[in-house]
Regions:
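Short, solvent-exposed secondary-structure boundary motifs
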Residues: 1-11
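Generic signature of intrinsically disordered, low-complexity, basic-rich segments
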Residues: 3, 68-71, 121
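STAS-typified acidic loop motif
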Residues: 9-45
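General small-molecule cofactor/ligand-binding pocket signal
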Residues: 18, 94, 116
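Residues that form or immediately flank small-molecule/cofactor binding pockets and catalytic motifs
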Residues: 22, 98, 120
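Amphipathic alpha-helical interaction surfaces in cytosolic regulatory modules
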Residues: 32-113
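Short acidic-hydrophobic, aromatic-tinged amphipathic segments that line or gate anion-handling sites
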Residues: 112-118, 122
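A short, charged, amphipathic alpha-helix used as a generic interaction element across diverse proteins
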Residues: 126-130
Length: 130
């Protein structure tokens, strides 16, 4: 199996991307918190490729199933942020639990991204619907 095929499988297994017009919702699986950094980076490249080709105006990252994450996932979020910002849009986080909220506050990333309790709240704030 080629490296690209493995990367695509990882991306499909650990990340779902759903388009809603010019808005996208990225849903990492709960298992993403247990992945080694190199695996997150590999899967992230596959997830980001279509987003870079056709950047959404706004991107919601729904963290509902994710209890915590490390620096590799933060780097992934930052890489997702750039193409969206270049389009004049926003990356926002939904389904943020208290532990993740505290991590984002400690790193001051809560000032970069708006945090919402639910995906629907985020979609409403960005002018979309589910």
């Amino acid at each position: 199996m080629s490296t690209d095929t493995k990367a695509a499988q990882l991306a499909n297994e650990y990340f779902q991307v759903k388009r809603h017009g010019d808005m996208a919702v990225l849903v990492p699986s709960p298992e993403v918190e247990h992945l080694p950094d190199t695996t997150i980076n590999t899967a992230a490249q596959m997830v980001l490729a279509p987003l870079k080709e056709d950047p959404p105006t706004n991107l919601i990252v729904d963290l509902t199933g994710v209890r915590y994450f490390g620096s590799a996932f933060i780097a992934f979020l930052l890489r997702c942020h750039l193409p969206v910002k270049q389009q004049g849009g926003e990356l926002v986080l939904a389904g943020v639990n208290d532990r993740v909220r505290e991590l984002l506050k400690t790193t001051a990333l809560d000032t970069l991204w708006a945090l919402y309790t639910t995906r629907q709240e985020a979609m409403d704030a960005l002018g979309g619907s589910d």
